[in-house]
């Protein structure tokens, strides 16, 4: 917030619900499914993990195409701010890395190994903070939109770092063969039986969150307010007030 200012954080928070929706869709709750099935230890764990990766990547490619085609419509017609266009395009770069990272985390959660997740998460956050502190001040001098876009793209770099760390923690004796990557019908059936209900449940909240800034901007524009004023006020609520309000949820979630 101190690096990009009120206007920057307001623009970022205007885009964030769209970011969250596509992130939820990109994972399709497959990490949760893999975690549960790995913990049961009844299946070929290698096939569960590595056969799911091509599926989730194909699904992400479809989402990337949707983002590329709809970014202009979302930014101009829904969010009413053309500056959102480039940051929304940047979301497409993050999806495969986020999905891969969470898939590997799901494997370790299923094995009840928390250390890989903890270490990868700490390093991921360090990378994100260092890159943000180093590059955002330079980018904001060029254009605020570039700085906000980088805040989206930095997730791609940090998630890639996390993937490398998680792969280091994978058992060294594992040899991935063609059969491990080839989807098995029973495994896919079991994975989808868990992921589809979970995704449907999460989508209800994500769609509501996605519609929040759209309805707010449309309503306030109809009431005669300027888009700059709306963006700043939404940024104050979503970027300052709500994080403080939801802070206690961190402790209950940890339990």
Task: Give the positions of each predicted feature.
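Alpha-helical transmembrane segments of multi-pass membrane proteins
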Residues: 81-103, 152-153, 237
């Amino acid at each position: 917030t101190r690096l990009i200012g009120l206007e920057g954080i307001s623009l970022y928070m205007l885009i964030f619900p769209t970011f969250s929706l596509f992130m939820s869709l990109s994972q399709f709750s497959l990490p949760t499914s893999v975690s549960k099935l790995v913990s049961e230890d009844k299946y070929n764990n290698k096939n569960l993990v590595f056969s799911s990766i091509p599926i989730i990547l194909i699904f992400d490619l479809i989402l990337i195409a949707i983002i590329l085609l709809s970014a202009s419509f979302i930014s101009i017609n829904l969010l009413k701010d053309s500056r959102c266009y480039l940051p929304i395009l940047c979301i497409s770069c993050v999806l495969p890395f986020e999905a891969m990272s969470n898939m590997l985390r799901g494997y370790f959660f299923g094995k009840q190994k928390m250390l890989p997740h903890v270490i990868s998460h700490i390093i991921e956050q360090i990378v994100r903070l260092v890159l943000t502190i180093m590059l955002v001040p330079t980018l904001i001098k060029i254009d605020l939109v570039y700085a906000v876009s980088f805040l989206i793209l930095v997730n791609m770099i940090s998630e890639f770092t996390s993937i490398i760390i998680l792969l280091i923690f994978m058992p060294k004796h594992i040899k991935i063969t063609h059969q491990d990557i080839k989807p098995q019908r029973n495994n896919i059936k079991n994975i989808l039986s868990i992921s589809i209900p979970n995704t449907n449940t999460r989508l209800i909240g994500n769609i509501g969150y996605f519609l929040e800034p759209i309805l707010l901007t449309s309503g306030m524009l109809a009431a005669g307010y300027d888009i700059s004023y709306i963006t700043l006020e939404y940024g104050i609520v979503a970027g300052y007030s709500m994080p403080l309000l939801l802070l206690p949820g961190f402790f209950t979630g940890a339990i």
